[in-house]
Swiss-Prot record:
The lineage of its organism: Eukaryota, Viridiplantae, Streptophyta, Embryophyta, Tracheophyta. Keywords: Developmental protein, Differentiation, DNA-binding, Flowering, Metal-binding, Nucleus, Transcription, Transcription regulation, Zinc, Zinc-finger. A zinc finger (C4-type) spans 26-53. It is found in: Nucleus. InterPro entries: HMG_box_dom_sf, YABBY, YABBY_C, YABBY_N. GO terms for cellular component: nucleus. It comes from Arabidopsis thaliana. Disruption phenotype: The double mutants crc-1 rbl-1, crc-1 sqn-4, and crc-1 ult1-4 exhibit strong floral meristem (FM) indeterminacy with reiterations of extra floral whorls in the center of the flower. This is Protein CRABS CLAW. Residues 80-122 are annotated as: Disordered. SUPFAM superfamilies: HMG-box.
């Protein structure tokens, strides 16, 4: 279990050591939980609820011994500790007791990335039609080109052999006001 201590200052208190901020990994979902404990509560057992999975854990802090810089923390999970992923009962003989295990980087749960959707048939048609109208008449304002493209869309039936196409021979030319070439 990775535990990290970081003293912080809250906005409501003036002393720089008003509370300690601890980073604790949830034993169920491995989410890093930031727990701020006021100094007056340092000897109490604090209940921590994971915001991701709802697991309740109890965080117990002990005061530092003389010569010790960091606090020792004990975290007991309230149910579900038997369901840890990758837990094993055997200890590794290759690790030496002189060297503490290297801390792994914190595990951060990120929201899933939004998938880029393909443009609709209307959006593709309008983009191509405005581009075609502006290439035929570069001085036309975008507003008029959009209006002409919208009128052409009203006459366009997708996936129809007789519909107008951006490169076809049935295209309404010019500004698209119903004039056929």
């Amino acid at each position: 279990m990775n535990l990290e201590e970081k003293p912080t200052m809250t906005a409501s208190r003036a002393s720089p050591q008003a509370e300690h901020l601890y980073y604790v990994r949830c034993s169920i979902c491995n989410t890093i939980l930031a727990v701020g404990i006021p100094l007056k509560r340092m000897l109490d057992t604090v209940t921590v609820k994971c915001g991701h999975c709802g697991n309740l854990s109890f965080l117990t802090t002990t005061p530092p011994l003389q010569g010790h810089v960091s606090l020792t923390l004990q975290m007991q999970s309230f149910g579900g500790s038997d369901y840890k992923k990758g837990s094993s009962s055997s200890s590794s003989s290759s690790t030496s007791s002189d060297q503490p295990p290297s801390p792994s980087p914190p595990f951060v749960v990120k929201p899933p990335e939004k998938k880029q959707r393909l443009p609709s048939a209307y959006n593709r048609f309008m983009r191509d039609e405005i581009q075609r109208i502006k290439s035929a008449n570069p001085e036309i304002p975008h507003r008029e080109a959009f209006s002409a493209a919208a009128k052409n869309w009203a006459k366009y039936i997708p996936n129809s052999p007789t519909s107008i196409t951006s490169g076809g021979h049935n295209m309404i030319h010019g500004l698209g006001f119903g004039e056929k070439k």
